[in-house]
């Protein structure tokens, strides 16, 4: 049972404890601890120590129990709150369709799940850091063991705070040194903590070894580059969101150049390390046989490891959600069943095809036809039959892949690719007016994709490149937040094929197809009608058991 992170007092140090999940870890790793019954605190004190380096690392690895459940859940906010994805997961009242239609509220499950697990991961990281500090002082762990464990804990804590502030704005900040779990902090405080943790991690962690499941010095540098880009684009304050909360108006874009310079600096540290590279084949970045740098090409920089539903805290359902019911599109005598997440309409494929028909990434990003390896039958995923399939969720890396991975959910989730580092550098340079300098990192991505290079990319080209390179990789709404174009980008659905009220008259549909595209139409209309300025933030949710967390709500909710 996970605890309400808000309903505890602060006495110098924040002393939250998890119960079942954490106590299981502590009972193995700690010299002094107790296993408590469900719902009772398990108090870690300054006297707790671990016995050795391996136990210290094991203690920190427990934080992943709060990251694994989020691997696919992030998509249900970050991708659904965009013009690219819709959800037919369960009834229309379920959390997936609710987010798809911009109808999320404080008790919408994905908001509850992500917010609470990120903070619970922070709690666990805080406790681990305290315990390992004690252990170093007691001579139980070596300096190398301390560096590896605390470096990882601070890396994961910083990543959690970055996700939280991107999605919820000013959030409470608390560490092993103290803080409040209910008092929201200004961005200077939040980003200051993120940067402190990441600079500590950079100094503590070892160089990238080729195993992206292990946080590295270069992974910390990449997150610093990401953080400075996000902060450099001046996230909207609560007051700024309140001013537009109930309107369909995007605020004016602004930036802070000094932070963008820091984004370039940290991107260059990754690039100049010589440890990372772009994979030669974009399509072989995704899938069980390609996960976590199995091909040794060093593009995967940081990943969340998964072994599957029965082995993880939760498997990675990115495949399951985009390819829930393989080949059930009504053709060849198969049933017609809707996946949990769907491409918003044919247009997400069509617009890309029209602009760059030879882009090698398109064929992997959206599938418009697939052959069933068991029957040899070809299935169409394009209207009037269906919408395109998010190809990065269809694991084709091994035999009969289309039918296997959805039951395993064991593919590691990619959090950072080297491609992101290159694009961060290119974007920061363009925002600073140094467009010609941006061409070199920008064109590396385009050369791999097999499309034309440019002498000086524009900001619009940078934005499109994020879509081309990172569709379905959990960047969509976060980029709209940075660029202050959330409302205008979502309202582009008005140009989509099945948005207009006369959509049915333009094609011939079977009954199943008509029912499917009726839902597509309804979701596109809802996106257009419902998106508001308040959606630059997610609602502060309840706790995992429905309790009030005591944190001030975001404007408009």
Each model region followed by its residue ranges:
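Conserved, well-structured interaction surfaces
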Residues: 52-71, 92-168, 178-192, 196-212, ...
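C-terminal motif of bacterial Sec signal peptides marking the signal peptidase cleavage site
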Residues: 29-32
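Short coil/turn linking the two alpha-helices of tandem helical-hairpin repeats
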Residues: 165-167, 172, 209, 230-239, ...
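Bacterial signal peptide processing site
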Residues: 34-37
């Amino acid at each position: 049972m996970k605890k309400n992170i808000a309903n505890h007092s602060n006495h110098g140090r924040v002393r939250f404890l998890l119960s079942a999940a954490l106590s299981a870890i502590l009972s193995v790793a700690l010299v002094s601890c107790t296993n408590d019954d469900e719902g009772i605190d398990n108090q870690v004190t300054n006297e707790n120590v671990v016995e050795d380096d391996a136990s210290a690392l094991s203690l920190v690895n427990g934080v992943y129990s709060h990251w694994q459940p989020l691997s696919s859940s992030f998509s249900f906010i970050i991708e659904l709150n965009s013009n690219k994805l819709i959800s037919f997961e369960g009834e229309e009242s379920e959390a997936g369709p609710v987010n798809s239609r911009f109808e999320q509220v404080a008790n919408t499950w994905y908001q509850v799940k992500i917010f609470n697990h990120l903070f619970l991961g922070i709690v666990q990281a805080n406790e681990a850091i305290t315990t390992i500090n004690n252990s170093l002082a007691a001579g139980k762990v070596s300096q190398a063991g301390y560096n590896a464990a605390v470096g990882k804990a601070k890396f994961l804590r910083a990543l959690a705070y970055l996700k939280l502030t991107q999605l919820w704005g000013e959030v409470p900040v608390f560490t092993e040194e103290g803080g409040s779990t209910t008092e929201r902090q200004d961005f200077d405080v939040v980003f200051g903590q993120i940067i402190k943790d990441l600079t500590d991690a950079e100094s503590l962690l070892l160089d990238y070894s080729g195993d992206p499941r292990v946080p590295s010095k270069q992974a910390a540098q990449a997150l610093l580059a990401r953080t400075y880009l996000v902060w450099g684009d001046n996230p909207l304050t609560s007051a700024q969101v309140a001013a537009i909360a109930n309107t369909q108006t995007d605020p004016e874009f602004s930036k802070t150049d000094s932070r963008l310079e820091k984004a370039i600096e940290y991107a260059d540290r990754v690039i100049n390390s010589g440890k990372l590279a772009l994979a030669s084949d974009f399509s072989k970045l995704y899938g069980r046989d390609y996960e976590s740098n199995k091909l040794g090409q060093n593009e995967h920089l940081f990943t969340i490891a998964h072994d599957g539903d029965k082995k993880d805290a939760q498997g990675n359902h990115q495949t399951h959600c985009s390819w829930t019911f393989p080949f059930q599109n009504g053709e060849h005598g198969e049933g017609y069943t809707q996946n949990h997440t769907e491409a918003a309409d044919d247009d997400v494929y069509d617009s890309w095809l029209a602009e760059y028909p030879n882009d090698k990434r398109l064929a992997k990003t959206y599938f418009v036809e697939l052959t069933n390896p068991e029957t040899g039958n070809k299935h169409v995923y394009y209207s009037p039959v269906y919408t395109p399939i998010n190809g990065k969720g269809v694991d084709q890396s091994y035999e009969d892949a289309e039918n296997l991975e959805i039951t395993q959910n064991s593919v590691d989730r990619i959090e950072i690719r080297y491609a992101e580092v290159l694009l961060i550098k290119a974007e920061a340079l363009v925002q600073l007016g140094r467009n010609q300098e941006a061409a070199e990192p920008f064109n590396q991505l385009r050369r791999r994709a097999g499309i034309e290079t440019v002498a000086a990319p524009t900001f619009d080209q940078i934005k499109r490149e994020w879509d081309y390179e990172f569709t379905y990789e959990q960047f969509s709404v976060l980029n709209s937040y940075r660029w202050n174009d959330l409302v205008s980008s979502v309202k582009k659905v008005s140009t989509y094929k099945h948005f207009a009220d006369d959509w049915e008259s333009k094609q011939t549909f079977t009954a199943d197809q008509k029912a499917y595209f009726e839902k597509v139409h309804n979701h596109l209309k809802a996106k257009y009608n419902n998106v508001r300025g308040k959606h630059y933030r997610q609602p502060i949710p309840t706790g995992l058991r429905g309790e009030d967390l005591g944190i001030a709500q975001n404007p408009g909710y």
